[in-house]
């Protein structure tokens, strides 16, 4: 089946896949070929896609996914392939984000810190999946 990932900056991914596991707002969602039509919200998290070459991990920064006519279209705020991520840097940023969350004084600061922490944790998880 065909999968496209689109961010505000344009196409990030346009490939044939065999299977995908998405970080939906209700938990992990697995999709195989000929899946029923579906529209779902996506959380910040790791997407795993099985291509002819094997499994690939990408970090998605929240958005929506549509499954229709054996094609998956993913619209997200941002995306990053695991092979582009420096694990040591991501772990350092995750620790900083956790510290920022602990020091957040206002509800708005807490929300922003939680989102930042989720992004860095997803990056660490994506790289760990690829190893």
Curated annotation (Swiss-Prot):
Q: Does the keyword Cell membrane apply?
A: no
Q: Which UniProt keywords apply?
A: ATP synthesis, CF(1), Chloroplast, Hydrogen ion transport, Ion transport, Membrane, Plastid, Thylakoid, Transport
The UniProt gene name for this protein comes to atpE
Task: State its location(s).
Answer: Plastid, Chloroplast thylakoid membrane
Provide the function of this protein.
Produces ATP from ADP in the presence of a proton gradient across the membrane.
Protein name listed in UniProt: ATP synthase epsilon chain, chloroplastic
Q: Quaternary structure per UniProt?
A: F-type ATPases have 2 components, CF(1) - the catalytic core - and CF(0) - the membrane proton channel. CF(1) has five subunits: alpha(3), beta(3), gamma(1), delta(1), epsilon(1). CF(0) has three main subunits: a, b and c.
Write out the GO MF terms.
ATP binding; mRNA binding; proton-transporting ATP synthase activity, rotational mechanism
The organism's superkingdom is given as: Eukaryota
Single GO cellular component term: proton-transporting ATP synthase complex
- Keyword Ion transport applies: yes
Query: What is the species of this protein?
Result: Cyanidioschyzon merolae (strain NIES-3377 / 10D)
What Gene3D superfamilies does this protein map onto? F0F1 ATP synthase delta/epsilon subunit, N-terminal
Family membership, please give it: Belongs to the ATPase epsilon chain family.
């Amino acid at each position: 089946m065909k999968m496209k990932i689109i961010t505000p900056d344009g196409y990030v991914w346009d490939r044939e896949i065999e299977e995908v596991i998405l970080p939906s707002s209700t938990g992990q969602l697995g999709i195989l070929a000929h899946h029923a039509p579906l529209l779902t919200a996506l959380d910040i998290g790791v997407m795993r896609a099985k291509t002819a070459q094997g499994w690939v991990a990408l970090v998605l920064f929240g958005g929506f996914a549509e499954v229709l006519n054996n094609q998956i279209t993913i619209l997200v705020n941002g995306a990053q392939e695991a092979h582009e991520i420096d694990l040591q840097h991501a772990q350092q940023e995750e620790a900083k984000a956790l510290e920022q969350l602990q020091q957040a004084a206002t509800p708005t600061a807490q929300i922003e810190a939680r989102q930042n922490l989720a992004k860095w944790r997803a990056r660490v998880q994506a790289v760990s999946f690829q190893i």
